[in-house]
Design a protein with these regions (language model features):
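NAD-dependent ADP-ribosyltransferases
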Residues: 1-160
């Protein structure tokens, strides 16, 4: 598995992906924080269903990595481009994100849709504060779409 060759992301590794390598470069992280902050944490658990066909699956040690954990997100273009691709389910290019929701209804609907086509689904529940304690950002898709002026590929009025 690709994720096996990477260590789980933590608070030492994540800032390296958010800030530029060269000191003289302008960092998007100074302008628009993605750094993990408890004040941004959802009040509900993060929910994700996955199956044998899902791009991000837990490793043997329980770590769930994105398909491109090494991708740099230190400038507006890299964030906008990678997030635009992530939102479009037809684009299967590895990216630095893992999708979660706080909506049990959305998870239930997705599971019912997938089970007929893809078989059994596994539900993973994550405490957002655990992610933040490990230095991992928790992003709100609609807020990021608004900030980076990303068009909703499915016309859902940015209900993510």
């Amino acid at each position: 598995m690709m994720a096996d060759k990477h260590h789980c992301l933590n608070r030492q590794i994540v800032p390296n992906r958010l800030f530029p390598e060269a000191v003289h470069q302008s960092a998007e992280e100074y302008l628009h924080l993605w750094r993990a902050m408890y004040s941004q944490a959802p009040k509900k658990p993060l929910l994700r269903i996955w199956d044998q066909f899902s791009g991000s699956q837990p490793t043997e040690d329980g770590c769930m990595m994105s398909r491109a954990p090494e991708m740099r997100l230190d400038n507006a273009n890299s964030r906008q481009d990678s997030f635009t691709k992530h939102l479009d389910h037809k684009v299967w290019i590895p990216g630095p994100y893992i999708s979660f929701t706080t909506s049990s209804t959305a998870i239930e609907d997705l599971a019912q849709m997938r089970v007929a086509k893809r078989g059994p689904q596994t539900l993973t529940v994550v405490d957002p504060n655990s992610r933040i304690a490990n230095g991992l950002p928790v992003l709100h898709a609609t807020a990021e779409m608004d900030h980076y002026n990303i068009r909703d590929p499915y016309g859902q009025l940015n209900e993510y």
